[in-house]
Amino acid sequence: MAERFEIVEKALLKLLEEKKYATLRDILTTMNPMDVAGLFDGLEEKQIPVMFRLLPKEQAAETFVEMEPEAQQLLIQGFSDNELREVLDELYVDDAADLVEEMPANVVRRILTQADPEMRSSINQILRYPENSAGALMTMEYVSLRLDMTVEESILRIRRQGVDKETIYTCYVLSADRTLQGIVTVKDLLLAESDDTEIKEIMTENVISVTTQDDQEEVAKMFSKYNFLALPVVDTEKRMVGIVTFDDAMDVMEEEATEDMEIMAAMTPSEKSYLKSTPFDLYKHRIPWLMLLMVSATFTGMIISSFESALALLPALTAFIPMLMDTGGNCGSQSSVTVIRALSLDELELSDVFTVLWKEVRTAVLCGISLAAVCFLKVLLVDRLLMHNESISLSVDLVICLALGVTVVMAKMVGCTLPLLAKRLGFDPAVMASPFITTIVDALSLLVYFLFAKTILGL
């Protein structure tokens, strides 16, 4: 699919360069606005306005919403007042609010000046809500019905108002003071026994809703759980103020998943895409965690230094340090990723900490015994018999295997408890991911290793 689109993209760019605008326009009108928006990423600045003006009015607005902020800003700066007004008239309020948030102050002033008073008021209302809240994510363009309306009256209202609404599949039944009473789907209206049936007789009551202050991540999870197409947003007095649509919830899911992946990789989350980020942008997001992890690794060095005398007496112990540290880090990462994912899907609660610990301890014991047994045979057969390393006695083999088994158990416990602890303290559990846990487990595995060596070998 990607290869086919790349071929089409090259063909369209060639038409643009050859100034075959009529042919190009005919092809663009058959394409999805999302795909058209992707074409602008490969254009030079002077080509962007040329291609955009080839699009029909409605398609131009839909494409504009999906474009990168840099291209949007370039177009706005080149628009006449009439052109800007035409694009804004075709935008939904939530898309216009997103546009305002992305633009610099001088561009924002021009957008608000050209927007009609109703849209300007709605944009300002959305922007007053906290960032990443349901209020900031919602749109006010939905179909509302009254309790006393009939099926026939409701269908007429949908026909009259639906063209400007973001979704018409679910309609919201409100009282006189705009309190949410229930929902009615278009299917309910079409299948009603009579056109004179009142809405209150066929509506679904006890509607699931969110408040304007709810976190957008929690809102997105509700879409995943209940398979909504749209979710009503109410204020503290249960008055309807807007809806969050499925496409916006999907954007939040993608954004949150990307953020978690970046945090788990020891990076500060970035709002820019990879190709739009400069080397200095990447540096700023990576260096703080790298510095922290480098400094924290000092403890590992201190442990090795404190046991220099033991290593001097039996240098063969040094050869197995990387294996112990890597195995411990891998085990801790497995547990942490599993728990972090379960927390993000709301499969785990803080009250489940002892259940998680008991499950991970049993898993760790099984893994530890298996790894220690294989390690014992490997050291005996490979290091002692094949490589003829006489310094590796059965006692040394025992030290290595015991340290490995204990390290696995400790790593699993650290990996499962730290994400839960982070959540309890109000941090993102993804912070306690592989790099951070590996650093802790490295220090613990060395400590266990050398303590076993001193105790069993008498070093």
Give each language-model segment a name.
Residues M294-L311, V374-H388:
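Juxtamembrane "helix exit" motif at the C-terminal ends of alpha-helical transmembrane segments
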Residues S121, D248-L282, C331-L357:
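Non-transmembrane, extramembrane segments of multi-pass ion/lipid transporters
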Residues M1-A265:
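Hydrophobic packing positions in regular secondary-structure scaffolds
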Residues K276-H285, E349-A364, L394, L398, ...:
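Membrane-interface segments at loop-to-transmembrane junctions
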